[in-house]
């Protein structure tokens, strides 16, 4: 969790490593709640920042469908943060669909990495 705190204090974007979504899903898996809880603590320690929750998808599916899916993923994380003590006025959610991949969409592993959410510090 200290790595998340440092990231919150020193970087403009926090990549929630390990928070990846199943194909065609926007449900947060229970095994990822620890990472999100560390993010909650980092945000509580940095109460002056606003956060944009940005959702992404892999390249499978239409642009329009992936846009909606990325928005649902961002909203799922926003809801988690707000129900765990982060004031909703500090949070916004946006979906970027399949844009800005962090890995190669030609492989299963790459697609898995691209099904993600990032926190952008504002």
Feature locations, PLM:
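N-terminal targeting leaders that direct proteins to extracytoplasmic destinations
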Residues: 1-9
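Short secondary-structure boundary/capping segments
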Residues: 11-12, 109
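Short amphipathic
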Residues: 13-17
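Histidine kinase transmitter module recognition
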Residues: 20, 42-43
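Periplasmic OmpA-like peptidoglycan-binding domain that tethers envelope proteins to the cell wall
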Residues: 25-34, 44, 52-122
């Amino acid at each position: 969790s200290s790595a998340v705190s440092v990231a919150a204090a020193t970087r403009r974007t926090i990549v929630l490593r390990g928070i990846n979504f199943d194909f065609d899903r926007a449900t947060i898996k229970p095994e990822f709640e620890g990472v999100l809880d560390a993010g909650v603590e980092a945000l509580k320690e940095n109460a002056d920042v606003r956060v944009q929750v940005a959702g992404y998808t892999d390249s499978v599916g239409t642009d329009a469908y992936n846009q909606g899916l990325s928005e649902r993923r961002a909203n799922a994380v926003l809801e988690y943060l707000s129900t765990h003590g982060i004031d909703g006025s500090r949070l916004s959610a946006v979906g970027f669909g399949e844009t800005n991949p962090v890995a190669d969409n030609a492989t299963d592993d790459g697609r898995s990495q691209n099904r993600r959410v990032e926190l952008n510090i504002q």
